[in-house]
Design a protein with these regions (language model features):
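Soluble non-transmembrane domains of integral membrane proteins
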Residues: 1-146
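Residue-level detector of functional hotspots within protein domains
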Residues: 55-59, 179, 195
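Long, contiguous hydrophobic alpha-helical segments, chiefly transmembrane helices and signal peptides
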Residues: 71-73, 123-125, 166, 191, ...
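Membrane-interface amphipathic helices and adjacent TM-edge segments
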Residues: 114, 191-216
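Interfacial loop/helix-cap signal at membrane boundaries in integral membrane proteins
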Residues: 126-179
């Protein structure tokens, strides 16, 4: 039972992240706590080492991100700051073979028992699929949730290329081929064809340098 006179609700959310992939080190390097400031940027704790952070800003959502899947807590009302911690499981621990990181978020939310909806949340438990995550913007009228930022697409120019060219082409190929593995193969061939003029020019330049090497 929640008392009627409390001004806010304290929330403690934690997860011991289970191993899902064969490549242990690569999975660890792609797992972290992500969070989005209200009407602001998406930030994350270190993916490669233990990290902790405390913020007083309003937060729209917080996520425990794994290599291919994420669990996300989206607040209808903003979370009032958060204390976050992520640390790898010790290699000598009995849990190391099945788990790879401990993650914890402590936060709070304004609460009024007299409101029609005193504390509403949306919880996403699913794959890091760009278009699927982006589709959740429809559940928030006030701002772009930016859940698609959970998908790592590289820096600046590479992110633009991946967002507007590579992902749409891949989704189209998946629909046509009906098989993701075949779609990846076809996309790889297409990229090699597109990049062939640049790579061929590089090979020719290297060959010329090898011919000149004895003279130099």
């Amino acid at each position: 039972v929640i008392p009627e006179n409390i001004p806010n609700l304290d929330i403690c959310w934690s997860q011991r992240m289970m191993r899902q992939e064969q490549g242990k080190m690569f999975e660890e390097r792609n797992s972290a706590i992500y969070y989005k400031y209200s009407n602001g940027s998406v930030e994350n704790l270190s993916e490669s080492s233990a990290d902790d952070e405390e913020t007083t800003g309003d937060i729209k959502w917080v996520s425990f991100k794994n290599q291919f899947f994420s669990s996300v807590l989206v607040a209808d009302k903003c979370l009032k700051g958060a204390k976050m911690e992520s640390k790898p499981i010790d290699k000598n621990s009995a849990f190391y073979s099945d788990y790879h990181k401990d993650m914890e978020v402590n936060t709070s939310i304004d609460y009024k028992s007299t409101d029609a909806n005193p504390a509403n949340f949306l919880i996403y438990l699913g794959p890091n699929k760009f278009q699927l995550l982006k589709s959740y913007n429809k559940y928030c009228d006030s701002e772009d949730l930016d859940l698609n930022r959970l998908v790592s697409l590289g820096w600046a120019l590479f992110r633009v290329i991946n967002t507007y060219i590579v992902i749409p082409v891949f989704d189209w190929l998946t629909g046509v081929c009906g098989n993701m593995g075949l779609a990846i193969l076809v996309l790889t061939i297409l990229l090699k064809v597109v990049l062939f003029p640049l790579s061929n020019k590089s090979y020719i330049s290297q060959a010329k340098m090898r011919l000149l090497a004895p003279d130099v």
